[in-house]
Every structure is written in C-alpha cells, then in structure tokens.
C-alpha cells in the first residue's frame, strides 16, 4: 500500500496502531510513500515515528480501557474486561472507525455499532458455517468459561481445542501436502555485498518498540541494538561495525558469537534513528502473500568510526523528553506519561 501511495495510486491512508517507519523494510521508501499522501491519519495510544508524519493523530485507547474479545494463535477466544477509563479524549479504535464512517456518511449504517459486544455479535453471524465458526459463543459463555476454541457452531458445542483431530477439512477427511519449489532470495550476495543480513527481535522489546522503549526496566535490560557477527569476521566485542546494503548503512557495537553462520550478520529492529535496522533491509514482496522479505538481504561489513545513535520515542509537544533510554542511555526512572495522551494533534 505504501508503494501505491508513492506512485499516487493511493491518496489517503488511515493507520491503526502501526508504526511502519520503524517496522517495515527499506525505511527511506516507506517515508517517501507516506510523504506522497494527500492525507494521512494515524490512530494510536502513544505517538510514534509514523504519527510524526501524519496530518492528524487520533488518540486511541489501550486494551485495558475497553472490553472485548481476543483470539490467540491456537484459536482460543477469551474476553477481557475494562480496567480503567481512557484518559482525555482517547477512544477505542472501533469507536473511532465507526465515528469516521458516520461523519463521512459513506455506508454509515454498516458501522452503527454502540459497543464492542455488538461488533462481536456481528462476528458470530458472519462466521456461521465457516472454519473459524464463532456462532455458538456468547459473551457470557466466553467470560464464564475463561475461553472457548473455534470452531464452535452452536451454544451447546464445547468448542474445538484440537482442530482436525478426527479429520481434515476435505471431502475424504485426509490432509493435503503442497510441496513448494525453493526460490532464491530476491537479493543474492555478490562480490560487493558478500554477507547476508537478517533482522529479528529481542526478549525485552516488542514490534517497533513504541511501547517497550518507554518502559525503564526494559530499556535498562536492552538499551540499544547491536550487530551479531561470527569471530571469523575479525571484530572484537564492542567494536563499531558498519553494516552496508544497497539501501543504506548504520554502525552498531559488535556482539561476537560462534552460534551465528559465518556468512550472516543479525540486527534487532525495534529502534528508530540512525541505527534503525530497516534503513538497510530490502522491500521485495512475496508474490502470493505480499509479505516483505525481511529476513535476508545482501550486505557487507567494515570497521566503523562511531556507533550510530538511536532516537527516543516521540512525545507530544510540551511533554518532557526524558523517556528512559533517550539518547542511548538507560536508567530505572519510570517512563514519562505523554501529557494529554488523548489530545488530537494535527
């Protein structure tokens, strides 16, 4: 979609609790796409690097500031209850989306929900007869049982903790295996870029780090990114290592380990600023899933002069910028709550 924005095919975009300026590959191209939009709105509960580029920021609420249901990867549907009121003008995401539809007047009757419970009732109807069938789950039943597994096609059905235990969803009940043909990565190594760069996560941080980079204990545990390299590359622990790809370069302290391949380097991606890993990654897309090829691109390494800085999380105008870990240091102070988290900002 951001590529379509860059070409002018998409004119306006609303993002909900996402931060592509940190989490998506080839950050420079992502920035060009957002800058090409005629209108850009972000909905989030903390300001992010992507919010900083938006025309309008609408304050969303945290999960504990509303009630609803959540489905995890194993198919278990659980209910969460409201623990606190959202501050200021912050509102749940569903309310904001419905209100935008109402004010635009475009199929507003399709968004005439007054609670998250009403939205769940719509899901029960829409999923009836499908593989992920929620129709037998009631609001009260989910809460009283602590969770129900889909499919659950009737209110007296126990749910399905183990999917396909008796038969698979084919006429003969048997599984289907689909062998795939191996494809090389979109960007192969060569004489100029002889190594492979892969990116990933750390235990202390989550996704783009927009929440975890504000929590002192987590910043103290993992204050900044590094580059993991094999001893054969000739670096010592803590050396500044410059990683270069066809899109950009950044310099990190070396973490020298024997558990990584000799032809591969690894960088965690949760940070913004000059040390953002996704400055360097390739934005080639899988032809079927359209998922970017995050995990492999060609690179080279050389000894750097200084370690690049990370950027602290954005805060609203007027809020003190003393988020723990700002500027690359860590301390044990509690994170500063952005003032007026519920204030819409242009």
Regions found by a protein language model. Give the residues of each.
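Glycine-rich anion-binding loop/nest that anchors nucleotide
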Residues: 2-5, 9-29, 42, 46
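C-terminal substrate/ligand-recognition segments
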Residues: 2-10, 18-19, 195-204, 217-247
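Flexible loop/turn segments at secondary-structure boundaries
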Residues: 20-25, 30, 47-51, 65-68, ...
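Long, contiguous, secondary-structure-rich segments that constitute the structural scaffold
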Residues: 87-89, 93-145, 215-228, 235-346
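Long, low-complexity segments enriched in small/aliphatic residues
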Residues: 117-217, 329
């Amino acid at each position: 979609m951001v590529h379509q924005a860059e070409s002018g095919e998409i004119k306006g975009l609303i993002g909900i609790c996402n931060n592509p300026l940190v989490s998506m590959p080839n950050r420079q191209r992502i920035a060009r796409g957002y800058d090409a939009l005629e209108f850009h709105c972000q909905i989030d509960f903390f300001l992010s690097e992507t919010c900083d580029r938006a025309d309008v920021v609408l304050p969303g609420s945290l999960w504990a500031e509303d009630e609803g249901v959540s489905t995890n990867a194993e198919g278990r549907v659980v209910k969460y209850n409201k623990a606190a009121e959202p501050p200021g003008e912050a509102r749940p995401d569903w309310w904001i989306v419905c209100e935008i539809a109402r004010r635009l007047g475009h199929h507003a009757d399709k968004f005439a929900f007054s609670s998250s419970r009403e939205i769940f009732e719509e899901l029960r109807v829409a999923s009836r007869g499908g593989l992920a069938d929620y129709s037998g789950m009631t609001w009260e039943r989910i809460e009283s049982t602590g969770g129900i597994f889909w499919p659950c096609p009737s209110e007296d059905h126990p749910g399905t903790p183990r999917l396909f235990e008796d038969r698979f969803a084919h006429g003969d009940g048997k599984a289907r295996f689909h062998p795939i043909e191996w494809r090389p990565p979109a960007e192969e190594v060569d004489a100029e870029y002889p190594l492979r760069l892969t990116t990933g996560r750390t235990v202390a941080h989550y996704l783009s780090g927009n929440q975890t980079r504000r929590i002192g204990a987590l910043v103290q545990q993992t204050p900044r990114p590094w580059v993991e390299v094999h001893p054969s590359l000739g670096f010592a622990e803590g050396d500044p290592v410059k990683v270069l790809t066809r899109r950009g370069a950044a310099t990190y302290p070396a973490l020298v380990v024997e558990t990584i391949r000799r032809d591969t380097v690894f960088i965690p991606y949760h940070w913004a600023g000059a040390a953002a890993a996704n400055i360097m990654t390739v934005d080639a897309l899988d032809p079927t899933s359209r998922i970017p090829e995050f995990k492999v691109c060609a690179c080279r390494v050389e000894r750097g002069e200084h370690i690049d800085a990370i950027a602290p999380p954005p805060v609203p105008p007027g809020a003190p910028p003393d988020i723990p870990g700002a500027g690359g240091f860590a301390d044990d102070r509690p994170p500063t709550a952005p003032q007026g988290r519920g204030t819409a900002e242009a």
